[in-house]
């Protein structure tokens, strides 16, 4: 008789534990989605980048120079990771990302060749491919585009306006951004 009494108790225990775990998982997912809707915030990374999807691939990224900061979403394993960063377009319309002291940046270590990512500019999301640039001529072109853009949008403690003749530091990296369909 004591065995038949123990079964309902054990069954209730398993049910309560299962419901508790499912509730915690659901709360975690909802919390992450809310966090993704709010961040990246200044220097705090976020999750998914939400926004209106771009109409199609972009050939000329010149409009990026009209937006103070761009937002980038990569995947760190299976988890989305998004950040605010400087992006700039060259006069030819090529888009580059700016990364100072990049060896220490969490996101940069997770970007491989032909890395799929998402960019958000002014609320619109663009599927893109990232590639680190190491050729000095292309890096200089991206650096000059950065200097030009930051004459308008620079300022503040995290994004100072550079001297127009500033030289590209050795610790500065750049990534070329291209549209993907």
Segment roles from a protein language model:
Residues 16-36:
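Hydrophobic membrane-insertion alpha-helices, especially the h-region
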Residues 8, 55-57, 69-72, 101-103, ...:
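Short secondary-structure boundary micro-motifs
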Residues 1-14:
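N-terminal Lys/Arg-rich, disordered targeting/topogenic segments
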Residues 1, 72, 97, 119, ...:
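Generic structural hydrophobic/aromatic packing signal, biased to beta-strands
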Residues 35-81:
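Short, conserved active-site entrance elements at the starts or edges of catalytic domains
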Residues 23, 102-181:
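Short, structured beta-strand-loop surface elements
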Residues 61-62, 87, 165-166:
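Short secondary-structure boundary/capping segments
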